[in-house]
UniProtKB/Swiss-Prot annotation:
Pfam families: YpsA. PANTHER family: UPF0398 PROTEIN SPR0331, UPF0398 PROTEIN YPSA. NCBIfam families: PRK13660.1. InterPro entries: YspA. This is UPF0398 protein BPUM_1952. Belongs to the UPF0398 family.
Length: 186
């Protein structure tokens, strides 16, 4: 796979409300592990739409990985112009920083938000232009990524790689073998 799309939960869907939330280190570590394996198999481009949560965290991981793998590129292709318009200032700053560092920035529809159809267009575009999808999503825990995943499932031979809650738990346990004992004391 040379080009992958990445999608996943928004921060509030995971109960994450701050950039310094401890859970983020484990999410980013799992993203880094998955992306590194794909890079070593020939990954060149990561596509995100710039949504808060898994996509922004992926961008941050890509920027870190570019230090070791400078050929890796990030594209931010939004569903419409000004998607950050209603975000708070902190999220806007984070988003604008991602756009400034991205290797390619574009919009699918070249106009402001008009209807949910623009999200469908974005999903279709991403799947048609990529070789696979990496999703921070657990089918047992519903959330916003389900729309992109449902679209991807309509395509024959389009690989979907999941990062599930079990994967994240394994990442936590790998980094902190005493995690379960600490949880029991709480």
């Amino acid at each position: 796979m040379k080009i992958i799309a990445v999608t996943g939960y928004k921060p509030f869907e995971l109960g994450i409300f701050k950039q310094d939330e401890p859970a983020l280190q484990y999410i980013k570590a799992e993203l880094q592990k998955r992306l590194t394996a794909l890079i070593e198999d020939g990954l060149e481009w990561v596509l995100i739409s710039g949504q808060l949560g898994a996509e922004i965290w992926t961008a941050e991981v890509v920027f870190e990985l570019q230090e070791e793998y400078p050929a890796l590129k990030l594209a931010v292709i939004t569903p419409f112009y000004d998607q950050e318009e209603r975000w708070n200032e902190q999220n806007k700053e984070l988003y604008e920083g991602i756009l400034a560092q991205a290797d390619f920035v574009e919009s699918v529809t070249h106009r402001p938000y008009e209807s949910p159809a623009q999200f469908k267009q974005k999903n279709r575009f991403f799947i048609e232009k990529t070789d696979g999808l990496l999703a921070l999503y657990d089918p047992e825990h519903d959330g916003s990524p389900k729309y992109m995943i449902k679209e991807a499932e309509n395509y024959t031979d389009y690989p979907i790689m999941y990062i599930t809650m079990d994967d994240l738990r394994a990442q936590v346990e790998a980094e902190d073998p005493f995690f379960d004992e600490k949880q029991e004391k709480i």
